[in-house]
Amino acid sequence: DGLSIKGNVEKVYDGWRFPKEWITTGFGLEAPKVRYINGYYYLMCAEGGTLGPPTAHMAVLARSKSINGPWENSPYNPVVHTSDNDEKWWNKGHGSLIDTPDGNWYIVYHAYEKGYLNLGRQTLIEPLEWTNDGWLRLKKGVACDKPIKKPITSQGQVGMLQHLSEFRVGKEWRFYREFSSDRYSVDANTITIQGKGDSPHNSSPLLFVGGCHAYELEVEIEFEGDATAGLVLWYNNKYMVGAGISPTARYSYRRESTSRRGSHKETSRIWLRLKNDHHIVSGTYSLDGKTWLKDDWGMEISGFNNNTLGGFMSMLPGIFTCGN
C-alpha cells in the first residue's frame, strides 16, 4: 500500500563525502530520487542541510547498473552547490532530473535568495549536459543568476498573480492551517469572510505567495457587525506584522503584540494599504478611497526567516478578519 516497509531494511548507498573544510549544517543525506537512463540507474540525493550557512546544501549524483548498487559517485559532484557567500542564490540543493520532449536535460532545485531569505525557498531550473563518460553536469557557460533560454516555448503568458482579485481559494489563496468552506463566499471579485478569533493571530488569515522584493497591497473593506479586518505579512501565528482596522479604530501588529494606533469617525467602509519596500513595512488608510492617511508606525522584517525562526516558512501577504 506504499505506507509500510516489507522485508529487512538494507543500506545500499553511503552518499558522497564532501570536503571537510566546507561549511555545512551536517552530512544530512536525504531526498533520494532515481531515474533510469541508458542502462544506468541515476540516483540524485541532497546533502549538507537545507538551512543554515549559505554553502550548506547541495545535490549529488551517483549511478549503478542495479537498483541495489553498488553505487558509483559522479566525479563532477556536487551537481549544484553554493560555493561562496557572495552568490545570489544560497543553499542550492534538493534537485530533480528533468528531461524535455526534445531530449534536453535540466535540474530543478530550490534555493534561498541572498538578502531575501524571508521569501522562503524558491524554485530554480538550470540546463545540464552529458559528459563523454556518461554523467550529467551543469551546462558550461550558464549562470543561475542570469536569464536562460526556456526549455519549451510558452503557449501563453500566465502571471502568478493575475487572478489574485478573483479570490480563488485553493489556488492562489489559502487559509492558514484551518479551512472551512462555510466561512467565506466569493461574488464578482468580492470575498465575504466570517470573522474568527479575537486578533489576526488566531484568525486563520487568507494568504498567497507574493514572491516579490517589494509590493503594495490595497483592500476595500466593508464591515458588518463588531469585526476587525486588515492586511498581514505572515510567517506563522507567532511571527507576523500587519495593520488592522475596525469601524472606529486602527491597529498595528508585530509578532504577538497588538497596538492601537488611532480612532476615526464610525464607518462601515474603509480602505487599507500595506507596503513592503524591500523589508520596510508601512501602512496607510482612507475613509473615502481618495485621500490616504498614515499612522506613526513602521517595521523591518528581514529577520522573519527560517534561519531565525525555523519551520521552513516564508512571509506571505494576505487578509484577515476577526471578531463577530
Q: PLM features: residue spans?
A:
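Carbohydrate-active catalytic/glycan-binding domains of CAZyme proteins
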Residues: 1-324
